[in-house]
Amino acid sequence: MEVKIFKLSDKYMSFEIDGITPSQANALRRTLINDIPKLAIENVTFHHGEIRDAEGNVYDSSLPLFDEMVAHRLGLIPLKTDLSLNFRDQCSCGGKGCSLCTVTYSINKIGPASVMSGDIQAISHPDLVPVDPDIPIVKLGAKQAILITAEAILGTAKEHAKWQVTSGVAYKYHREFEVNKKLFEDWAKIKERCPKSVLSEDENTIVFTDDYGCNDLSILFESDGVQIKEDDSRFIFHFETDGSLTAEETLSYALNRLMDRWGILVESLSE
């Protein structure tokens, strides 16, 4: 198995993986979608009653939205994630919640103001802050305030969508186009759309050895004189993350996770 990365940023990756079967490619796709752990807020405690600021002014902690709606919004906010944390049900604390499996947050703000994701303060793990500080949560009116504490734990998208790291996970076969110059008159225009590194040409034919990196080869799918070959052992993937993990961390975890699962399967079959 060989992996070749085409594009890489913190939140996006496109790559080619060679030497796997279609079923293994689909297993990687499914792992990227629903088997990558991330932090998400699971428990929220609201302080109800009067709240006083440093000057003794009194504010009402009642919110314009139901507590359940605010808690739901908090759960969907992407948080920076540390994969060294334990799943709570696998932690040495027995699921009670500790610094090895639980991250504590708080919000303390008075109105009139808009409460944003940037107002979420990480208490136990200062680096594990919201990815985007500008996500709106709730709007406070005059004499309104919010005071909450929240706990975030690791989970996967198999349990709930709030633990889904990736979006737009897709793949396709590696394609090669062989174009007959006599039957396809616009071959020269298509040639200009591709880098020289993916071109192979003689007097009668031109071959595009890789459609990745070319600017729109869709016309070749409907034209005479074009032979398309697909390699079912080479796949081009692309996906995005919500920023809780980098794209590189996400792919690395997915590949290691697959190797572990296949290893367990082989051991079970050998028994």
From Swiss-Prot:
Gene Ontology molecular-function annotations: DNA binding; DNA-directed RNA polymerase activity; protein dimerization activity
The reaction(s) this protein catalyses: RNA(n) + a ribonucleoside 5'-triphosphate = RNA(n+1) + diphosphate
Annotated localization: Cytoplasm
Keywords, ordered alphabetically: Cytoplasm, DNA-directed RNA polymerase, Nucleotidyltransferase, Transcription, Transferase
Any one Gene Ontology BP term: DNA-templated transcription
Catalytic class of the enzyme: transferase
Regions crossing the membrane: none
EC number annotated for this UniProt entry: 2.7.7.6
InterPro entries from the UniProt entry: DNA-dir_RNA_pol_insert, DNA-dir_RNA_pol_RpoA/D/Rpb3, RBP11-like, RNAP_Rpo3/Rpb3/RPAC1, RNApol_insert_sf, Rpo3/RPB3_RNA_Pol_subunit
GO terms for cellular component: cytoplasm; DNA-directed RNA polymerase complex
Alphabetical list of CDD domains matching this protein: RNAP_D
Physiological role: DNA-dependent RNA polymerase (RNAP) catalyzes the transcription of DNA into RNA using the four ribonucleoside triphosphates as substrates.
Protein family per UniProt: Belongs to the archaeal Rpo3/eukaryotic RPB3 RNA polymerase subunit family.
Subunit structure, as described in the record: Part of the RNA polymerase complex.
PANTHER family hit by this protein: DNA-DIRECTED RNA POLYMERASE, DNA-DIRECTED RNA POLYMERASE II SUBUNIT RPB3
Protein name: DNA-directed RNA polymerase subunit Rpo3
Organism per entry: Thermoplasma volcanium (strain ATCC 51530 / DSM 4299 / JCM 9571 / NBRC 15438 / GSS1)
